[in-house]
From Swiss-Prot:
It comes from the Bacteria. Belongs to the CheB family. It is found in: Cytoplasm. GO terms for cellular component: cytoplasm. CDD domains: CheB_Rec, REC_CheB-like. Its EC number is 3.1.1.61, 3.5.1.44. This is Protein-glutamate methylesterase/protein-glutamine glutaminase 1. The lineage of its organism: Bacteria, Pseudomonadati, Pseudomonadota, Betaproteobacteria, Burkholderiales. It holds the Pfam family CheB_methylest. PANTHER family: PROTEIN-GLUTAMATE METHYLESTERASE/PROTEIN-GLUTAMINE GLUTAMINASE, PROTEIN-GLUTAMATE METHYLESTERASE_PROTEIN-GLUTAMINE GLUTAMINASE. Keywords: Chemotaxis, Cytoplasm, Hydrolase, Phosphoprotein. The keyword Nucleus does not apply.
C-alpha cells in the first residue's frame, strides 16, 4: 500500500468481547484498514464516534442498553456514515437486518462462527470486501419509510397478489435483475411500482442463506406482484418475482412453451452463489430478445459479462446510474464492457422498464 494512503478506520460495536476481538483480528490483518476502537454497546459507541471519527461502523443488530436499530436510526438522522450490520443467522436476525438496510445501513455480514476455523478465510475476505465497499459508499441521509407506510403508499397493505394457477397462462417477456451491495433497497424501489400483470421477474441478489426467504416475504408485503423465493422446477409466471435462494444459483430454463426456474448448487461464480452472471447467461440462452436485463448497485463485476451476453442475444439492458448507486461497481463494469443500452437513475428505472416493455408490444420473439 502506498505510504500516503490512509487506512480505513473501523469502529466495531458488539456486546460480545469475543466477537469484537475476532472482528478486530480480521480487519487488522488487512493492509488497508484498521480497527480504531471497539464498543460493547451503542452508548459507548456514540462517544467513540465523536473521538475517532471512523470511516466505517460495524454494528451488531441486537445489543443491551440500546437496540441496534434504534441506534442506527438516530445515527443516520444525526450523523450519517457507512454502517455494515453484523447479524445472526436466525429468522429474527434476518428481519432486523432487512429493516436496518431500509434505515440506511450499507450492507451486512453474518456473525463469525467462533471456534470454527473452516471457512474463516472466506469469511475474512467477505468482511474486508464489505468494509472497503462501505468506505466508498454513498450514504443516504433520509431513511426509507417503514414497510407498512410503503405498502400503504402502493395500495398493497401487506396482502399478497394472488397466485396464477391457470395452466394456459405463460409469460413470454421477462425482467432479469442482478444486484449486490445496496441491492435490497434498490430492488424494492424497482419492484414496488410494477403492476400486478407485469412480466415475471427473476432476481439474483448477493445474500447468504437464511436471509432470502425473509427478503422475499418482506417484498411480498410491499409489492402489487407476488414475490417469493425461487423453487427448483417451478413455472415462471407473470405477476411474480422470483428471488434466488442464498444457497443456490438461479437459472432460467424452458420446458416446451413454459419458462422454468432451475436451482443449481454448482460452485460459486465470481465468488458468489447465487451469481448474477449465471442468471444473466441463462436468460441470454433461453429468453433472448424476450428479456430485459437490469444490473443494479453492487461491488465487483458479477453480472457484467452476463449482461453483455444478454445484449448480444437481443435483450435490451439497463444499468443503474452512478449517482443513485450505493456502490457503482457492477454497473460500471457492465457499462465498460459495452453491455448496457440505457443508464437510468433508480427513481426512474421501473418507468423505463415498463416503457420498454410497452414498446415491445406483442411482437414476442420465439426462441
Amino acid at each position: 500500500m502506498n505510504a500516503v494512503q490512509k487506512k480505513i478506520k473501523v469502529l466495531c460495536v458488539d456486546d460480545s468481547a469475543l466477537i469484537r476481538s475476532l472482528m478486530t483480528e480480521i480487519i487488522n490483518s488487512q493492509p488497508d484498514m484498521e480497527v480504531c476502537a471497539t464498543a460493547p454497546d451503542p452508548l459507548v459507541a456514540r462517544e467513540l464516534i465523536k473521538q475517532h471519527n471512523p470511516d466505517v461502523l460495524t454494528l451488531d443488530v441486537e445489543m443491551p442498553r440500546m437496540d441496534g436499530l434504534d441506534f442506527l436510526e438516530k445515527l443516520m438522522r444525526l450523523r450519517p456514515m457507512p454502517v455494515v450490520m453484523v447479524s445472526s443467522l436466525t429468522e429474527r436476525g434476518s428481519e432486523i437486518t432487512l429493516r436496518a438496510l431500509e434505515l440506511g445501513a450499507v450492507d451486512f455480514v453474518t456473525k463469525p462462527r467462533v471456534g470454527i476455523r473452516d471457512g474463516m478465510l472466506d469469511y475474512s475476505e467477505k468482511l474486508a470486501d464489505k468494509v472497503r465497499a462501505a468506505s466508498r459508499a454513498r450514504v443516504r441521509q433520509n431513511p426509507q419509510p417503514h414497510a407498512a407506510a410503503a405498502a400503504a403508499a402502493h395500495g398493497h397493505a401487506g396482502a399478497a397478489a394472488p397466485l396464477i394457477n391457470n395452466p394456459l397462462v405463460s409469460t413470454e417477456k421477462l425482467i432479469i435483475v442482478g444486484a449486490s451491495t445496496g441491492g435490497t433497497e434498490a430492488i424494492r424501489e424497482v419492484l414496488t411500482p410494477l403492476p400486478p400483470d407485469a412480466p415475471a421477474v427473476l432476481i439474483a441478489q448477493h445474500m447468504p442463506p437464511g436471509f432470502t426467504r425473509s427478503f422475499a416475504q418482506r417484498l411480498n408485503g410491499l409489492c402489487r406482484i407476488s414475490v417469493k423465493e425461487a423453487e427448483h422446477g417451478e413455472r415462471v409466471l407473470p405477476g411474480h418475482a422470483y428471488i434466488a435462494p442464498g444457497h443456490a444459483h438461479l437459472l432460467l430454463a424452458r420446458s416446451g412453451a413454459n419458462y422454468i426456474a432451475h436451482l443449481s448448487d454448482e460452485p460459486p461464480v465470481n465468488r458468489h452463489r447465487p451469481s448474477v452472471d449465471v442468471l444473466f447467461r441463462s436468460a441470454a440462452q433461453h429468453a433472448g430478445k424476450n428479456a430485459l436485463g437490469v444490473i443494479l448497485t453492487g461491488m465487483g463485476r458479477d453480472g457484467a459479462a452476463g449482461l453483455l451476453e444478454m445484449k448480444k442475444a437481443g435483450a435490451y439492458t439497463f444499468a443503474q446510474d452512478e449517482a443513485s448507486c450505493v456502490v457503482f461497481g457492477m454497473p460500471r463494469e457492465a457499462i465498460a464492457m459495452g453491455g448496457v443500452d440505457d443508464v437510468a437513475p433508480l427513481s426512474d428505472m421501473s418507468r423505463r422498464i415498463m416503457a420498454r416493455l410497452a414498446s415491445m408490444g406483442d411482437r414476442v420473439q420465439r426462441v
